[in-house]
Amino acid sequence: MSNGGNAGKKSSSYFHFGAGLGSGILSAVLLQPADLLKTRVQQSNHASLFTTIRELSQSPNSIRSFWRGTVPSALRTGFGSAIYFTSLNALRQNVARSNLLRTIGVVEQKSMVHSSSLPKLSNLANLTTGAVARAGAGFILMPMTIIKVRYESNLYAYKSIAGAGRDIFLTEGFRGFFSGFGATAIRDAPYAGLYVLFYEELKKRLSHIVHSSPQVEGLAEKVDLGLSKNMKGSTSASINFGSGVLAAGLATAITNPFDAIKTRIQLQPKKYTNLVMAGKKMVGEEGVKSLFDGLGLRMGRKAVSSALAWTIYEELIRRAEAVLKREKELVV
């Protein structure tokens, strides 16, 4: 009995790791041009989006130029998503199973039709678990993040990913692979926490609206995990994607200053040595506007990438759990 439970937990972890990896790689490849443009715009105080697009379009191999840095970006985002979703699921499952936390209201006890099969927690629990999981994943993937940002930038003439890593180590040492981690953590942890909070709340509200509409009234028969049997996969995916877009837009707008500072530190660590100094220098030399460089690009990219990654992830998990449930029923 115990072995079966452990096997189930391992299978669940593999499901979440695989789903996170697949969703992360796909979203990274599709949205690499937007990520590259954001890096180029943020690295300079005079380059506009249209100027940057024109420069890339006029390069010898324009298509390839827009997808420069795709490999490190896909590796970072893919494995970052895999680690993040796996650790986030573990945290949320442990919180959901805690009788103490359930007693004080951290776990939602009210059952309702929902577009997701993931654990239902309070806003505070969603905020905290999202932030903790992202900070941990960010630290593990920081070296790849540094290589990705440097490789995308035109401040460095790196010809390969290996060459970029070698140059960073020789010129800055091991510490160079973690330049800007403070700014990255301060940006990513709150972003992830806010995203999960907004995302789960929006999903809950949209699921309630859809379920309460005349077209789906009376379809309230539920299965385990609070998911309606009659809520079609396409309906769930639409709710999840819409919630993801809105949640990402809100979280991105709030955390963009840290993203702008982080990019400067990672690109020019000798000029911008730490978070506070970089922020003061940017505001003093370029004004408050510099803290919101690339906001439009980042908001657009984050809205699509986060919504896409979470929708694919949730759909893969939903299908995997449905298959697993059918297999268990056949065994019984």
From Swiss-Prot:
Function as written in the Swiss-Prot or TrEMBL entry: Mitochondrial glycine transporter that imports glycine into the mitochondrial matrix. Plays an important role in providing glycine for the first enzymatic step in heme biosynthesis, the condensation of glycine with succinyl-CoA to produce 5-aminolevulinate (ALA) in the mitochondrial matrix.
Entry GO terms, CC: mitochondrial inner membrane
Ranges of the Solcar repeats in the UniProt entry: 11-94, 121-205, 235-319
Organism (species): Botryotinia fuckeliana (strain B05.10)
InterPro entries: Hem25/SLC25A38, Mitochondrial_sb/sol_carrier, Mt_carrier_dom_sf
Molecular-function GO terms, alphabetical: glycine transmembrane transporter activity
Superkingdom: Eukaryota
Family: Belongs to the mitochondrial carrier (TC 2.A.29) family. SLC25A38 subfamily.
Name this polypeptide is given: Mitochondrial glycine transporter
